[in-house]
């Protein structure tokens, strides 16, 4: 539930738009020339060496976290992890699995299929009995994981989702969706029946957790409620935070189009309809991050007030257009213009938002007043979050401002509205019928500006990894925070005093980065596949 970072954005894989364009792109670049044999051999050798390091030296029972020090003495997912832990949340274990399948598609080398199989073993072990996944799993067992939550997790001031162990699974941050999509892709590769039970459990988890109106909670199944600072437990609320509904619809569409499971059509359509019923009425036709069970906007974490969220509204408008292109039903377009008008009307005056940002993140229900988030104190024990109308000194780790491209939203709507339903649904798996369309060839490829195949080959070190900036560090756990506020100012920082285990930016720390691995492998895959645009 963190604010979208570049790592997290890039870890988000195929969206509904990709499903719609997969057929159109399937022949793209078919006339491109393959690289010379010698160059191709160099690329493939580099890929193999890097992946061998990953599978033989870095993986723990097939799973991965996000970042490692070169000597493996410390490692991190969204928080510092232990040696026996693997991270499910992207760009973690399942994301690496997607990359291995992509490499298999590019090279035909069964080594990468076997690497993907190792990842699947870790994910199947980590799968909750109900069928979903938590952010993290620990091969040392649940007792060890609970102890981690009660120490490292509990003291991450800004990471409230890690301060308590619920013992269930989460849709947050696409961990469940990423894992489920990977198992689907791996099963479809050779139809190996050993993956089908876990895949079926994941599908059933998405179906079982869906509310009758079509929305999904953040966590499932429901367990004993946990209160943070006196607030109700938000994890059962229907949520749009971090694209939960969009990810689940995407997964179900992928299953519908490949497995021939006709029963999935109804939950897909109900999931889409949930966007209609949760859109607020005039004069504030936007969406909240989450809702009560009677569909009223509600607070979640202590820095997510009851409000309408501008970035969520913009994302949901994009999805409404995609739903029209999937179904041809104009009801999904009916209220798009008024929501765009509303977003335009609440743009901040010049000079209020930082450069590149246009809107406040949170808008007060009933007033259109921007709500700006602040904090005081120095750790999870003595600190608190609050909001007011002051745009100065807002949080560093969760921006009070968002970039909303009104012009792009209007064009997206206009282009869709100009299409007839028949034109809009060309290539839609919901129109073509279940079990008809293939999935895209690649899922995990990331952009890598300025990186070439030659530079990627040259920069792989003798150990077999790309040394890269890790981007952040954290205080090792030393004990619970004090009730006394430490000297200093922590209102705009990513981390509090030395008891705060939340990661913080660090431009000096280098090591082994999953993101760097995926970016470099993406460059190399593009170099050997002539169907990829250059």
Label each region the model flagged.
Residues 17-28:
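Bacterial N-terminal signal peptides
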Residues 4-18:
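Bacterial N-terminal signal peptides that target proteins for export
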Residues 205, 272-274:
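Extended amphipathic alpha-helical interaction segments
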């Amino acid at each position: 539930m963190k604010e979208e970072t570049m790592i997290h954005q890039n870890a988000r894989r195929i969206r509904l738009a990709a499903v719609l364009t997969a057929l159109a792109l399937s022949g793209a670049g078919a006339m491109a020339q393959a690289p010379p044999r010698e160059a191709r051999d160099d690329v493939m050798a580099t890929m193999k060496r890097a992946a061998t390091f990953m599978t033989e030296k870095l993986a723990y029972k097939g799973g991965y976290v996000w970042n490692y020090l070169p000597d493996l003495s410390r490692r991190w997912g969204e928080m510092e992890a232990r040696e026996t832990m693997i991270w499910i949340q992207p760009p973690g274990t399942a994301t690496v699995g997607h990359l291995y399948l992509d490499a298999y598609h590019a090279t035909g080398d069964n080594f990468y299929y076997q690497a993907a199989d190792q990842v699947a073993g870790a994910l199947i072990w980590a799968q909750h009995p109900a069928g979903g996944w938590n952010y993290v799993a620990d091969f040392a067992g649940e007792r060890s994981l609970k102890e981690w939550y009660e120490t490292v997790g509990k003291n991450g001031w800004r990471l409230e989702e890690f301060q308590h162990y619920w013992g269930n699974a989460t849709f947050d941050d696409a961990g469940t969706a990423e894992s489920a999509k990977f198992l689907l892709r791996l099963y479809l590769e050779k139809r190996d029946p050993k993956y089908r039970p876990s895949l079926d459990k994941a599908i059933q988890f998405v179906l079982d957790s869906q509310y009758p109106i079509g929305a999904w909670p953040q966590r499932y199944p429901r367990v004993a409620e946990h209160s943070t600072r006196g607030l109700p437990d938000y994890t059962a609320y229907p949520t749009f935070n971090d694209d939960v509904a969009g990810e689940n619809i995407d997964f179900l569409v992928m299953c519908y189009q490949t497995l021939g499971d006709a029963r999935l059509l109804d939950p897909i359509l109900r999931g889409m309809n949930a966007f209609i019923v949760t859109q607020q009425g005039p004069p504030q036709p936007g969406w909240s991050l989450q809702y009560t069970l009677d569909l009223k906007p509600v607070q979640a974490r202590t820095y997510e007030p009851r409000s309408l969220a501008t970035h969520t509204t913009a994302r949901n408008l994009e999805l409404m257009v995609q739903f029209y292109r999937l179904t041809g039903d104009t009801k999904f377009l009916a209220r798009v213009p008024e929501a765009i008008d509303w977003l335009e009307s609440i743009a901040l005056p010049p000079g209020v938002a930082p450069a590149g940002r246009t809107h406040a993140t949170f808008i007060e229900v009933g007033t259109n007043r921007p709500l700006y988030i602040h904090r005081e104190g120095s750790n999870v024990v003595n600190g608190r979050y609050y909001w007011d109308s002051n745009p100065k000194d807002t949080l560093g780790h969760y921006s009070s401002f968002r970039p909303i491209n009104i012009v792009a939203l209007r064009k997206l709507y206009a282009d869709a509205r100009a299409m007839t339903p028949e034109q809009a649904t060309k290539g839609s798996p919901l129109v073509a019928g279940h079990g008809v369309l293939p999935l895209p060839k690649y899922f995990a490829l990331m952009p890598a500006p300025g990186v070439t195949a030659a530079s990627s080959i040259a920069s792989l070190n003798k150990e077999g990894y790309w040394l890269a900036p890790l981007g952040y560090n954290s205080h090792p756990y030393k004990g619970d925070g004090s009730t006394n506020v430490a000297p200093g100012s922590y209102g705009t920082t990513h981390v509090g005093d030395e008891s705060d285990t939340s990661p913080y930016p660090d431009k000096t720390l280098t090591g082994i980065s999953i993101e760097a691995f995926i970016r470099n492998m993406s460059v190399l895959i593009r170099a050997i596949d002539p169907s990829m645009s250059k």
